[in-house]
Amino acid sequence: MSANILVFDSGVGGLSILAAVREQLPSANYCYLFDNARLPYGELDEQELIQGCVTLISQAVIQCQADIVVVACNSASTLILPALRACLKVPVVGVVPAIKPAAALSQKKHLGLLATPGTVNRQYTQDLIDQFASDCRVDRFGSSELVYLAEDKMAQRPVDSEALHRILAPIKASGLDTLILGCTHFPILREELQSYLGEGVHLLDSSNAIAARVVSLLEPSMSGEIGKSQALYTTDSICEGLRKTLAAWGFRSATAFRDSLMPIGS
């Protein structure tokens, strides 16, 4: 049988993770749920984030008959994984900033972490730095605005280059040689980031590591059969430009998640 993989994010950022997983498991069935009604997660109260995500994902696991859940959001992963794993019987894979490989790659031992304010400031992130990059200088840059710029690009709207350069100016001025993209939205802007920061700055994200983890957790019998069905659910309406982009990713239609839920007992 083909695996049913649920990918969850606050917006379209999780598509960067989905792309990496789909490259490894092209025959799986994919269900993508994004909670765009509460975007961006990096600004939410922690308890609201935990309770809301656990409720949504638990419902989606049933709806999609998921064999595995990928929480394709750094802000959520730094908070909700223990609670989510406690209430689900299927494996849960979270996303963490690629601090360990960045520390190994950096020649200057000078890293930057670009993420939402929530991820940048959490103790979980500090623990990763202490564990894997204690010999490095790690500058942290928090931005929720960059999330919206990534959403604009996916909605086929122009990316505000002035805003982008304002956000990136302190990063460029710092002199770092390795930048960790600690939000799954940010690889969407990889071309724009690289263009402004220059080829001397390495950009790292966690997508390939997450894909490898998903493959390792699935039963071997789930990786070979032909499936390839795809379902997309949102918690708020989306614009026509985003619909067109999502169609190019194989999601031909978007369904309001609340409308999709099966009645209890059905």
UniProtKB/Swiss-Prot annotation:
The protein's annotated pathway: Cell wall biogenesis; peptidoglycan biosynthesis
Keywords: Cell shape, Cell wall biogenesis/degradation, Isomerase, Peptidoglycan synthesis
Translocase listed as a keyword: no
Pfam family, any one: Asp_Glu_race
Active-site annotation: 73, 183
Signal peptide: none
Gene3D superfamilies given in the database record: 3.40.50.1860
Name of this protein: Glutamate racemase
Taxonomic source organism: Shewanella loihica (strain ATCC BAA-1088 / PV-4)
Gene coding for it: murI
